[in-house]
Regions:
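Hydrophobic ligand-binding cavity/cleft-lining segments
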Residues: 1-36
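Charge-dense, helix-prone N-terminal extensions
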Residues: 2-4, 8, 13, 43-45, ...
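A short small-residue
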Residues: 2-4, 98-103
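Alpha-helical elements of Rossmann-like donor-binding domains used by nucleotide-donor carbohydrate transfer enzymes
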Residues: 17, 83-85, 123
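Hydrophobic pocket/interface hotspot
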Residues: 18, 28, 45, 58, ...
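Short, intrinsically disordered, mixed-charge
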Residues: 20-33, 63, 118-129
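Hydrophobic-ligand binding "helix-grip"
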Residues: 33-39, 48-96, 102
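A conserved amphipathic terminal alpha-helix motif
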Residues: 103-135
Length: 135
């Protein structure tokens, strides 16, 4: 069974600018509707995406290249443990970002989460462009 979403993007900003967008509360708020994050392994994460909130705990943190956290919806839990990971790979003035969301319970949830992450990654790319222009 395919229980995962995996998406990749390449952005025109240095990794030093990109990693904080996935690993700090201020960075997440640049492309999500809201976020709180305790940036340490075991720290709590809470994000708002439109009218939904997701919660989790930081599972791994290896700046400036990797963060992963558990993920579940506050109002409508998935009923399984799922994990979101971002890998941020330096490529000179550009950065490759891979998002993986694994442990989704069924094909319908995979499809819903893929659509959701595509939307939010578009906003992530916009935030990267804005930061690159300021740098």
């Amino acid at each position: 069974m395919n229980d995962r979403v995996e998406l990749q993007t390449e952005v025109g900003a240095a990794r030093a600018l990109v990693f904080p967008l996935v690993a700090t509360a201020d960075g997440l708020r640049r492309w999500l509707d809201g976020a709180t994050l305790d940036p340490r392994v075991g720290g709590e994460l809470r994000v708002t995406m439109r009218d939904a909130q997701a919660v989790g705990r930081i599972l791994a943190l290896d700046p400036p290249q990797h963060i992963s956290f558990s993920w579940d919806w506050l109002e409508r839990p998935l009923g399984v443990a799922s994990v979101v990971a971002f890998d941020v790979i330096d490529h000179g003035a550009r950065t490759w970002v891979t998002l993986r969301h694994v442990g989704l319970p069924n094909a319908a949830q995979v499809a819903l989460h893929e659509e959701m992450w595509r939307h939010w990654l578009d906003r992530f790319e916009e935030a990267c462009r804005a930061l690159a222009q300021l740098a």
